[in-house]
Amino acid sequence: MDLPGNSSPFTQPSLCRQPLSRASWEARSPKRPRLQPLGTPSSLEKASRRVLAVVLEDVMTTNRVPLTHKEDTPSPLTHNHHQDPVCTQSPALPSQQVKWSMQARPPDPLHLCREPLTRARQSSPALRMRSRAASGPEESPSKKTDQVPQPTLVVVLEDIASGRQPAEGFDEDQPNLIVPAQSTFRSLKGPGKHCHRRGLDLEARPTLTLSLHPRAEPVTKAGQPMPTPSDLEPPFQLSTLPADPPESPVPDPALETPVIPTSSSLLRPRLSPWGLAPLFRSVRSKLESFADIFFTPNKTPQPPPPSPPMKLELKIAISEAEQSRATEKITSVSPRPPIRQWRTQCNSLAPVSKSSLGRSYSCPDLGPPDPGSWPPVPSQPSQSRPRRHTVGCGEMARTPPPPRPCLRKEVFPLGGVGVSPSLTTSCSANAPASFFCEPAEPRLGSTKGKELRASKDKVFSDPETKTMGKVSRFRIRRTPVRLQPNLTPMGLPRPIRLNKKEFTLEEIYTNKNYQSPTTRRTFETIFEEPRERNGTLIFTSSRKLRRAVEFRDSSLPRSRRPSRGVRTAASRTLTPNLAPSQDVGSLLQERLRELDALLLEEETDKEHPCHL
């Protein structure tokens, strides 16, 4: 293929456009051979082998050298193996039934090499003109038709993942892509010469074949009108029936795909040619960017372009606006001294202590002072003072610089009005360390005075006037406070109860230290009168009840029952109080004596019942 501007000699060895395959790489690789067979692609390689081929054909030059050469030069099909061979076609087959072999592959992978498309097939213009002149003068109408620029665009998406064997007799240096663009504009007259003439016309046109493959390398040349973004892997081949030239291989019927229309009938009107140069440029640029993005193995990240500098306009409203001298008699609303007074103070007097960071007491310094009639403010002694932070830290501040512009919003802004010198704020020399001036009180009953007093209260209610403490100093009570015995749970005093065991009837009925028994412990008391029947006492209750009831003091806490673990421990190891002592025998003897005496008394009572 000879593109315009490519004047390389014909004797330069041409290279194939096919990328390096797995077999040729493994044959030269020093690594150990893989476990897979030699010609079988892996699953990853099958997934990655998807070729997008774009064929751009355009006739860049319409006028050729006059056909005055001799006819002694043989055709490039027989003279040079490195020229683009054109598969011939019999007259019986029309041009629309051209079959494309999508799976054709070179048989010997060891002889593959790589070269960009622009250097693959380079034929000299003189040889092309001589071979064109060999067709005879009877082909002149067809030549005029072929000289018209007729661009063609063919896009074929091929899946080459399947591993089919190539056709037999395939020449290893032949290209796999030929576009019969002009077959529809020719008449099939002679079986031999006309097919040979059509092959020469196709070779004369610059054909741009673009293949996007992961192994392709971008190569460009300065003399090309359309540089290719990557090397070519030929995706398909035009397979036709053989004619006179014996170099055309016989295609395998198993490798043929269904008949597709030609590129000229797809994208070009048959009557009037039309130019596709802008479309070719846009497609080429898009495909170049696509190949550069997706098929670059390791693309170094480039830093982003420097952004243009951003211009920010910040407008801050300062407390003193442009004042006209005609409006200087209007009174001020702000509770701080005027700005001109601060300007005079900054240049004439020593630096005073910095004002607080409150709402209205940081005043701006907007430049050189005007020679005004404002009275100077007495300077405060520069001494270290504690900073007024809300955090409560006690850091000692250094001597503060002169006050700076107050960029915070005023509580009561001036609103562009001046301040009368008669109502200048009066500052005393005994003011605190933080510079604070009290403005003179305006007229009574005015709303300005109320606003002034409200601003004062707002300043004094700042959190800096409060005593701040750390949270860790507060004691967190984890256990509740025990209740006092002389107070009720509500905090009321308890009634004093008598520590008695025997109560009179009056005390009981007057509810003095008496608690009515609950339903669970309804005991009969001594006040019940038993009835005597047949010499026996009958009580109202059916069960045996206790006569004496010990009333405990309710103010005293109840004795808690020992837990089960304490009981078991006490049963195993006796306490010293419960341990047997040496006086147990004497105590038992005394108890037996008392029992004997009691029995004797009962017997005597039975014998003499009248004594009761």
From Swiss-Prot:
Positions of region (Sufficient for heterochromatin association in interphase and chromatin association in anaphase): 1-135
Positions carrying N-acetylmethionine: 1
Biased composition (Polar residues): 1-15, 86-96, 342-359, 570-583
Residues with PTM Phosphoserine: 307
GO cellular component labels: chromosome; nuclear lamina; nucleoplasm
Compositionally biased tracts (Basic and acidic residues): 448-463
Main location: nucleus
Keywords annotated in UniProt: Acetylation, Chromosome, Myogenesis, Nucleus, Phosphoprotein
Region: Required for the interaction with GRB2 and sufficient to promote the phosphorylation of AKT and cell proliferation, residue numbers: 85-405
GO terms classed as biological process: muscle organ development
Localization terms from the record: Chromosome; Nucleus; Nucleus lamina; Nucleus, Nucleoplasm
Region annotation Required for nuclear localization: where it falls in the sequence: 546-563
Region of interest called Disordered, as start-end residue ranges on this chain: 1-48, 65-96, 119-150, 206-256, 323-405, 444-463, 553-583
InterPro entries: PRR14, Tantalus-like
Compositional bias ranges of the Pro residues kind: 243-252, 366-379
Region span, Required for nuclear lamina association: 136-392
Claim: Acetylation is one of the keywords in the record: yes
SUBUNIT field: Interacts (via proline-rich region) with GRB2 (via SH3 domain 2). Interacts (via N-terminus) with CBX5.
Function per UniProt: Functions in tethering peripheral heterochromatin to the nuclear lamina during interphase, possibly through the interaction with heterochromatin protein CBX5/HP1 alpha. Might play a role in reattaching heterochromatin to the nuclear lamina at mitotic exit. Promotes myoblast differentiation during skeletal myogenesis, possibly by stimulating transcription factor MyoD activity via binding to CBX5/HP1 alpha. Involved in the positive regulation of the PI3K-Akt-mTOR signaling pathway and in promoting cell proliferation, possibly via binding to GRB2.
UniProt protein name: Proline-rich protein 14
Species of provenance: Mus musculus
Gene coding for it: Prr14
